[in-house]
Curated annotation (Swiss-Prot):
This is Hairy/enhancer-of-split related with YRPW motif protein 2. It comes from Mus musculus. The gene is Hey2. Residues 22-46, 318-328 have a biased composition (Polar residues). Residues 1-52, 310-339 are annotated as: Disordered. The keyword DNA-binding applies. A motif (YQPW motif) lies at residues 329-332. Its main location: nucleus. Highly expressed in the aorta, lower expression detected in the heart, brain, kidney, lung, muscle, ovary and testis.
Length: 339
């Protein structure tokens, strides 16, 4: 009876030993224990990696959206459709491609020149205002097309518009030809005597005040060249003093003479284009500079004449007859204020 008890105890001890040994010597126990001990670190690494990946993806999407917003603002066709409906990304990209193709076809001269675009809009707006003034004078005020006040007012406004366009054209030409000093040509106009702005050159009469004339009063021979004055006040620049002399205000023009002739020819071309594009006739509304007057000014400036320029009181018979028929100069405020 003792032997079975010993065997039982020995088997139980062996089972206990095996059980204990199996718990300690299980092959996957070490790995599982290591995983249990390192599981928080591994989880934090995975979460950090996912978080970092999400941040990178968010930044990439934000960069794409910002670029698309800039394209929608810069491309004119997309900017026009911005308020109507929400544009898709594919539409914005397609409009950008079309815009770049247009720029490539036009040689790069597109909407990038903001100053030129603003100048064009200003010129168009001024012309529209001029058309509205002409319509108002004829329809509301009931003035005839041949009324002196209507003719003079429309001629004055058209002169201002043409001078603005010609000044912009000459400034852009001077900027392209002389990038270091784009506005040096303006000195040629600031020092020219007022007599050069007269329709008949250096010859004028004391009894002939300068005023804006219509196309029927100016001879066609004086329409070959146009002097675009860059003065702020056109009326004060076109008026002559009562005396017969002009103050010595012609210093040497040096390099400014090189661009003077080009400026005059460019202004003449601009005036011709404006006359063809607008239904009214503006040929006589511009201050003319004859060729002999331009040559005299160039010679006087090149030789640096020290004595003042004198204006002869006598004039040709044709000019005298024209001067006697002209009205004296009247400020625009007194006439327009009557409305």
């Amino acid at each position: 009876m003792k032997r079975p008890c010993e065997e039982t105890t020995s088997e139980s001890d062996l089972d206990e030993t095996i059980d204990v040994g199996s718990e300690n010597n299980y092959p996957g126990h070490a790995t599982s224990s290591v995983m249990r001990s390192n599981s928080p670190t591994t989880t934090s690494q995975i979460m950090a990696r996912k978080k970092r990946r999400g941040i990178i993806e968010k930044r990439r999407r934000d960069r794409i959206n910002n670029s698309l917003s800039e394209l929608r603002r810069l491309v004119p066709t997309a900017f026009e459709k911005q308020g109507s409906a929400k544009l898709e990304k594919a539409e914005i990209l397609q409009m950008t491609v079309d815009h770049l193709k247009m720029l490539q076809a036009t040689g790069g001269k597109g909407y990038f020149d903001a100053h030129a675009l603003a100048t064009d809009f200003m010129s168009i707006g001024f012309r529209e205002c001029l058309t509205e003034v002409a319509r108002y004078l004829s329809s509301v005020e009931g003035l005839d097309p041949s009324d002196p006040l209507r003719v003079r007012l429309v001629s004055h406004l058209s002169t201002c518009a043409s001078q603005r366009e010609a000044a912009v054209m000459t400034s852009s030409m001077a900027h392209h030809h002389h990038p270091l000093h784009p506005h040096h040509w303006a000195a040629a106009f600031h020092h020219l005597p007022t007599a050069l702005l007269q329709p008949n050159g250096l010859h004028t009469s004391e009894s002939t005040p300068c005023r804006l004339s219509t196309s029927s009063e100016v001879p066609s021979a004086h329409g070959s060249a146009l002097l675009t004055a860059t003065f702020a006040h056109a009326d004060s620049a076109l008026r002559m003093p009562s005396g017969g002399t002009v103050a010595p205000c012609v210093p040497p023009l040096s390099t400014s003479l090189l661009s003077l002739s080009a400026t005059v020819h460019a202004a003449a071309a601009a005036a011709t284009a404006a006359a063809h594009s607008f239904p009214l006739s503006f040929a006589g509304a511009f201050p003319m500079l004859p060729s002999n007057a331009a040559a005299a000014a160039a010679v006087a400036a090149a030789t640096a004449i020290s004595p003042p320029l004198s204006v002869s009181a006598a004039s040709s018979p044709q000019q005298t007859s024209t001067g006697t028929n002209n009205k004296p100069y009247q400020p625009w405020g007194t006439e327009v204020g009557a409305f």
